[in-house]
Amino acid sequence: MERSFLVFHVGTYTLGVPAEELIEVNRNLSCTKVPGSPKMIRGILNLRGLLMPAIDMAAYLNIPHSACESFSIILKVQENNIALMVDSIGDIMALNEQELVLPPTHLSGQFQETIQGAFKLSSGLLILVDTAAISRNAQHHHGHSQDQIPSLPILSE
């Protein structure tokens, strides 16, 4: 069965989220910092009266050399709105869900629940992230320090 995904980039990684959850994409939205919030939460974004956490995807996935300041992907995940802060936006791609390669079983912590798998593309891998897991982790952060979170693993092609 084909399903559409919004493709985006964080550092050197190509990631995707289900297009049906997409509300809009914006450039350079500012958010209000919240004292004491974890590093992955950039702050609270007010988009036309809708308040939502602004999640720094580079910090969330521990991807170095990425500022995630260029684009905000606004999503409706179940009953919650979230904003993913990313480096750049790609296309919306229709992919066959049967071609999804499951992630390695040795992933742990938030990566085990966040990475749903990957699609093989001609240009490399598209890593599919679970937006429901990101939303849960953003709203019920377990207090992980940056040092306790492993970096995003390299999936072999």
Each model region followed by its residue ranges:
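An acidic, low-aromatic, low-complexity terminal/linker signal
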Residues: 1-157
